[in-house]
Amino acid sequence: MDAVGAAGGGAMLPAAARRGQPPQPPCMTTAPEQQAAAGGAVIWPAAAAAEAKEKMVVDARTMQLFPTRSADGVVVSPAPAPAAAQERRRPEVHVTPSVPATAPTAPLTIVYGGQVLVFEHYTAEAAEKLVQRTQHLLAAAAGGGGGNKNNNVTVVTPPPDEPPMLLPPPQMPAASGVSAGGVMPIARKASLQRFLQKRKQK
């Protein structure tokens, strides 16, 4: 390196800095013949590069996507990940052999016990399996109970070209004292009648 400055405490300024280029770290060799032999690239001494790699602590859990810089200013490129680690990162795809990947799906609507259940993207094969399983469970329950009940389960699947119907939310009984049958309690009814009679008289 070529330096300009006084020996008695003056600032050392590299020649590259005088030309507007960034200064190079002192551990680099910058002989012009070595740079020309390397195609103009900066040549690092092998000892300095090995020392810099030892100083770098790389966490195995992080992905080293970009070159990193050690405390000495030495740039160390990331090491390629082992093949086993790369295979671990790939998501596993499980394909069920009985259901092709392009099976048409439709919403499945089940009405049971006053509740409406809607399942999106249900295949016809899965719906058939569900119906068979439900019939099996109902037959087992009817056989064990000894009752002569007629348990029918209806599974409705709309055609795929129709938009799904949205059901209104269930109506909650009003908190005004009206019961589910629409009959007011007798005491409130009598009180309301007295109020209306007095209002008519005024």
UniProtKB/Swiss-Prot annotation:
Residues 1-31 are annotated as: Disordered. Keywords: Jasmonic acid signaling pathway, Nucleus, Transcription, Transcription regulation, Ubl conjugation. It is found in: Nucleus. Its main location: nucleus. Ubiquitinated. Targeted for degradation by the SCF(COI1) E3 ubiquitin ligase-proteasome pathway during jasmonate signaling. Residues 1-11 have a biased composition (Gly residues). GO terms for cellular component: nucleus. A motif (Jas) lies at residues 185-200. GO terms for biological process: regulation of defense response; regulation of jasmonic acid mediated signaling pathway; response to wounding. Residues 12-21 have a biased composition (Low complexity). A motif (Nuclear localization signal) lies at residues 187-194. The keyword RNA-binding does not apply. Residues 101-136 form the Tify domain. The jas domain (185-200) is required for interaction with COI1. Belongs to the TIFY/JAZ family. PANTHER family: PROTEIN TIFY 11D, PROTEIN TIFY 4A-RELATED-RELATED. Repressor of jasmonate responses. This is Protein TIFY 11g.
